[in-house]
Amino acid sequence: MLTVALPKGRIAEQTLDIFAEIFGGEFRFEGRELIMEKEGFCFLNVRNQDVPTYVEHGAADIGVVGLDVITEKELDIIQLLDMQLGKCKVAIGIKNEDELDWSRPNIKVATKMVNITKNYFAKKAVGVEVVKLYGSIELAPLVGLADAIVDIVETGNTMRENGLKVAEDIMDSSAHLIANKNSFYAKKEEILSLYEKIKAVVEKNG
């Protein structure tokens, strides 16, 4: 049996739809259900940020999670497939009236993605002071807490509604199929068989 960690919400539903397309039947978590067993799989319904942790530590053999989370956590896992779900960008946002000035010696940035932010600014050879927030990140430049933010952008509406604009894209992100390294070698045939089936559906729906 393969254990699959899925992030609560839309990505989990879309991934389970792929399993339904492959194996038939209905794949759904009922109500507040956190574990579901079906067709030789055990599905775990966990928080998005926790998926790669479950996979890295072997509590799940495989998982589905955004590339932004994988990049931020810098975990030792195997990336198998871009599932083309939940497409978005990680971007720098600033107030509409501001411009991003890379000549400044230091920029203060509010974000929950500390590693992505530090690494990006290091590549630009610009000092960065990171203020870690867990929500309502768009508020930070408006109240003088930060010069800019680094956040997930899908349509850009949330930034626009709060008087911000995208100054620069850092990376594209979408949901990826990942695997625990030990599981991949111990259950290689099982995992690769599932990988091929999922890949076929992703390419067909692409």
Name the predicted role of every residue range.
Residues 1-206:
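Domain-level signature for soluble enzymes in the chorismate/prephenate branch of the shikimate pathway
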